[in-house]
Amino acid sequence: IVSTQDSDHYGHAIKAMNAGYDLLLEKPVATTIGQCVEIQKTAEKSGRKVFVCHVLRYAPFFTLIKKELNSGKYGKIVTINHTENVAYWHQAHSYVRGNWRRSEDSTPMIIAKCCHDLDLIVWFMGAKCKRVSSYGSLDFYTEKHAPEGSSAYCYDCRYVSDCPYSAERIYIKDRAMKGHLGWPCDTIIPEPTVEKLREALKRG
């Protein structure tokens, strides 16, 4: 199982296949097209199997959609409008503070998050994609949108009690203090407790 950070997938996958292992490879497969091609070539050369974790195909909600589309009752599907709704706290956790905050360590959101959605669309349509376009920019989570008098770290900030992105609220009050110490708390620190989380979050 390769479930490391995005930028590590390629190296770990190649080494595992060369060592004789079949792979369950967490998405995204790799961070560049060249790395993806190399993983495919290595799999073919070594006779290893690579399974990518596109798990949403097996969720009851999406299997029902696929069944309905395949039934033909809706005719030919010409357009799919599919939205990836990332909750504000999830955005703050994963893509501002978390493991996917730096482009050097991860992939763009269309790959890191939306590859599930792209996989579903291809699966729903039963055909290969001919073209993909993606556009966007970093706009909201920037220094110019920070409230006046805010600080670099949550726990030093005058708005910590009212901010929707408050680390104290997201990790401590809404989760740890209610006994929910799994994701996302356990991505901040192994075996989290309220005290350990606060200490880790205070250090940034």
Functional labels for PLM-detected ranges:
Residues 56-203:
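Predominantly a Rossmann-like dinucleotide-binding segment in NAD(P)-dependent oxidoreductases
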Residues 1-42:
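Beta-loop-alpha module in the N-terminal Rossmann-like domain of NAD(P)-dependent dehydrogenases
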Residues 1-4, 53-54, 112-113:
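Small/polar loops that bind or transfer phosphate-bearing groups
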Residues 38-55, 75-82:
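Rossmann-fold dehydrogenase core element
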